[in-house]
Amino acid sequence: MAEHPNVARIRDGYAAFAKGDFDVLTDLFADNIVWHSGGRNQLTGDYRGREAVFGYFARLMEVTDGTFHIDLHAVLADDEHGVALAIVTASRNGKSMTANEADVMHLRDGRVTEFWTTSADPYTVDEIFG
């Protein structure tokens, strides 16, 4: 079975995030994307619109002094949905974390319209992000 084209688009998006390539992310994210960041920390909330999501990314890097990193392991996708499995690492104030993460996406015409990030260790995530 051939790989769905959205798998490659999602993989490219994670690679672009790692490089800070916002041109690729601009193409991947719908203008009206909604990004859901769960937990009970300073980054928790719903970010509406591409610019708000990019602001969230900037804050994420600021809070972790640029140590936030995603190691992508698997991507599944079809026309309407995407799932990415990854390991996230970050450090802040002398504390470090490594956590498994599952990201779920709604897609329309190859663009991410909604995104949920879910950590297997939400308490550690909250501790790192304060």
Spans of model-derived segments:
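Short, low-complexity N-terminal intrinsically disordered segments enriched in polar/charged residues
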Residues: 1-31, 129-130
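A solvent-exposed, acidic/Ser-Thr-rich amphipathic alpha-helical stretch
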Residues: 30-80
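A short hydrophobic beta-strand element
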Residues: 78-88
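Short, cysteine-centered beta-strand-loop-beta hairpins and adjacent loop/turn segments enriched
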Residues: 90-97
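Short beta-strand edge/turn micro-motifs at domain boundaries
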Residues: 104-126
